[in-house]
Amino acid sequence: MHPRIIPALSLKFPPLAIFFAQEPPSDAKEMRSLCSMLLVAQAAMGRTMAITRGTCRCPGAGKGLGLEPSNHGTIPGGGECYLHFFPTRKQDLEHGHTMIQKLTVGGASQTMTDDRSGREYLYKTLEGMVQRPGHLPRLQPEAPYVVLKPLEALVPDEKPKVVSLLIEPDQLPALVSLSDRTRPGIDRVWLPFTAGCASMVLYPLHEAERTNPRAVIGLTDTSTRFYLRKALGKEVVAFTVPWGMFVEMEETISNGLIKHCA
């Protein structure tokens, strides 16, 4: 497939097909990483990346990539430790010490363990954080691997669940407009408050199951931007859509619309 949207928007990076697989594709590269965003960067450079539960040392990556159920009780230190991560100092909790020790044993970098032992200040109160898990999509993993692959490199038996476009902010208006052209309403795009991996995989997968799916703007998480800045630059955001929605957008590309928006 040669997407029309690439020349229309002069995309710097190839659209990424994201799908599940029982086995890694023959052209896939498997590598361990601290953060899944480093693997996203590899895919953006044209490589096929196959990710499984043990690939990333970040304890939230398996959930954000749809490889584990959204159950935060399985995070090192337990659910209580997770809840206290954002609004309070986890190093003051017994569970917090457990999580930090497990991360260290697992080979996490000093940067990551220092980050997890402090605060992210994303929630003002614990009460706000307690409500967060109830808003997360509940998806069951479809296969052991999630694959990130340039859309143009797909072989006939590979079909993406979602497609992610890594774009610059000036290209966002065109994609928002394309998303809203074919269906009524004004809520075809949203930006969830979530991790980078979840914004590219978990939430778009959830949207793919809805009757009226939405595009998901992502890579707005502060940690995500730290890991991607060196590899892809500081201007990159993600615009991820279910496969059917991407096909609709491809069919309705308007040169006039692109000229005014991109």
Feature names for model-found ranges:
Residues 2-262:
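Acidic, serine/proline-rich low-complexity intrinsically disordered regions
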